[in-house]
């Protein structure tokens, strides 16, 4: 029977995902087989496992920290928002259906057997399971039939670490207020409090910590400093989107309302000479060196949004001067047309940006697969991409085909009927269904080198390393920091064997 510990937060973005990843890394370094678990994740970023199953990328990141292969049992329920009131519901890696929030709220209790089955499967492997909650356990409107916070903690008898974010202010009110809103049974599960993202001299917190421990009757297990660790963390998205630093090379990523899988650009963010900006207006777009159109959970809706706010016209104008690269939903937008006969998204027919000679038809069935190989021959300014190795995955609703009898440049040799490699217009515009195509850094290096040559600047090649190697160093940094600022003896003392109600 595996031992368990759970990390819950006072709010979203409190740093739960990082802390779970850090604990996974520490337990792994200490010789344990460890695995992450999150019963239900709501996220725009997802990943495809070796088995072709879909799961949240936060648990993939945590699995990497634990040194194990991502498995869908680490995240049995994934919700991918499709609009402001509903999500695509994915259970055990496969799409169940789209549901409005109210319908899912009533339905979710039927998924408890799936959660228990996934957790028990994980127990077959792990000595320790580190569980991540979602949002706050004190959301009164969500506590009924809870399956992700205290409901899950009760389900597997997990002790809880409660995390508050001091960077946004009011951390003592966050922690004490959350404890006050818990039932006695729930509060008894909370074994330690963590103050996260602190900047400055810890001693100034001493009066507040003393009051918190006296009134909350729960010890403070650690005060963790703000960490500039570059990992694929759902909790850091706001900071990432708002980041506006200046670099020698300026990359603009269109931030449409339903942006997804923007982890494709993480490799560029590690490069000191590169600035990655997420833009949602024409004024923010300015004149970058390259524009990326990322994935989308509502391709037609996001294209309409671009059309209405002027970004489509601005990107089309820039495509005459600089590279424009679309991935997955962004790739579909760049084509001649998008049809949705089955009402997967908006329904009907829509003209695309008409920058690539493809037509897309959206379908209910989702393509989910890992893929690897070499980028096929492409012309244009990024022709040096030809032959670059990639290891990535496809995850999309719909199929694309050439809209003319043009030469199938970029079609993969073993799947010539599907445009699953990289295609171009022969000049500045490129598209691909492949997520993670830049993660090996070879393709990323081609893009950065092209821009550097064009601008007549030098870039530090040593900064363009394997993204995998880069992440390994980040996980070790994260673990080192937590060892220094958390009472790990106390954390080990909290671990207990999972039991089922």
Curated annotation (Swiss-Prot):
Any GO BP: cobalamin biosynthetic process
Top-level taxon in the UniProt lineage:
Bacteria
The GATase cobBQ-type domain covers: 248-443
Signal peptide start-end: none
Q: Which UniProt keywords apply?
A: Cobalamin biosynthesis, Glutamine amidotransferase
The record's active-site residues are: 328 (nucleophile), 435
Which Pfam families does this entry report, sorted A to Z?
A: CbiA, GATase_3
The pathway noted for it is: Cofactor biosynthesis; adenosylcobalamin biosynthesis
Listed GO molecular functions?
ABC-type vitamin B12 transporter activity; catalytic activity
Family matches, as SUPFAM superfamilies:
Class I glutamine amidotransferase-like, P-loop containing nucleoside triphosphate hydrolases
Function, as annotated: Catalyzes amidations at positions B, D, E, and G on adenosylcobyrinic A,C-diamide. NH(2) groups are provided by glutamine, and one molecule of ATP is hydrogenolyzed for each amidation.
Q: So what family is this one in?
A: Belongs to the CobB/CobQ family. CobQ subfamily.
Official protein name in the record: Cobyric acid synthase
């Amino acid at each position: 029977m595996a031992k368990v510990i759970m990390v819950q937060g006072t709010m979203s973005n409190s740093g739960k995902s990082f802390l779970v990843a850090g604990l996974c890394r520490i337990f792994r370094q200490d010789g344990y087989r460890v695995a992450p678990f999150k019963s239900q994740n709501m996220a725009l970023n997802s990943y495809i496992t070796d088995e072709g199953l879909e799961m949240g990328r936060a648990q993939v990141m945590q699995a990497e920290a634990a040194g194990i292969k991502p498995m869908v049992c680490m995240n049995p329920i994934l919700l991918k928002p499709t609009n402001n009131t509903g999500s695509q519901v994915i259970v055990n890696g496969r799409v169940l259906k789209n549901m409005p929030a109210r319908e899912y709220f009533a339905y979710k209790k039927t998924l408890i057997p799936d959660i228990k089955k996934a957790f028990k499967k994980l127990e077959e492997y792990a000595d320790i399971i580190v569980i991540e909650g979602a949002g706050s356990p004190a959301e009164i409107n969500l506590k009924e039939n809870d399956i992700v916070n205290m409901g899950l903690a009760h389900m597997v008898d997990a002790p809880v670490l409660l995390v508050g974010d001091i960077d946004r202010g009011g951390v003592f009110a966050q922690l004490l207020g959350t404890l006050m809103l818990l039932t006695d049974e729930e509060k008894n599960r909370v074994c330690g409090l963590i103050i996260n993202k602190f900047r400055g001299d810890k001693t100034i917190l001493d009066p507040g910590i003393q009051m918190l421990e006296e009134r909350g009757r729960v010890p403070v297990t650690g005060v963790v400093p703000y960490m500039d660790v570059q990992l694929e963390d759902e909790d850091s998205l706001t900071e990432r989107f708002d980041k506006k630093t200046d670099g020698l090379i300026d990359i603009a990523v269109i931030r449409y309302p339903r942006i997804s899988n923007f982890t494709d650009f993480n490799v560029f963010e590690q490069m000191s000479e590169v600035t990655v900006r997420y833009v949602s207006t024409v004024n923010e777009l300015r004149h970058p060196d390259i524009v990326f159109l990322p994935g989308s959970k509502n391709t037609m809706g996001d294209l309409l949004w671009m059309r209405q706010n002027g970004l489509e016209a601005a990107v089309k104008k820039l495509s005459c001067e600089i590279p424009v690269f679309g991935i997955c939903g962004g790739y579909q937008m760049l084509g001649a047309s998008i049809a949705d006969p089955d009402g997967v998204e908006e329904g009907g027919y829509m003209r695309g940006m008409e920058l690539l000679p493809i037509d897309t038809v959206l379908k209910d069935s989702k393509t989910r697969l890992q893929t690897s190989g070499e980028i096929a021959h492409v012309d244009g300014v990024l022709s040096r991409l030809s032959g670059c190795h990639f290891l990535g995955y496809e995850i999309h609703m719909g199929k694309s085909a050439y809209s003319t009898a043009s030469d199938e440049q970029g079609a993969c040799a073993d799947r010539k009927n599907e445009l699953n490699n990289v295609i171009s217009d022969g000049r500045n515009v490129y598209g691909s269904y492949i997520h993670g195509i830049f993660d090996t850094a070879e393709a990323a290096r081609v893009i950065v080198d092209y821009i550097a040559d064009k601008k007549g600047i030098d870039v530090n090649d040593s900064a363009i390393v394997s993204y995998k190697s880069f992440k390994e160093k980040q996980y070790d940094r994260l673990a080192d920091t937590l060892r220094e600022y958390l009472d790990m003896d106390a954390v080990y003392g909290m671990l207990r064997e999972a039991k089922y109600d």
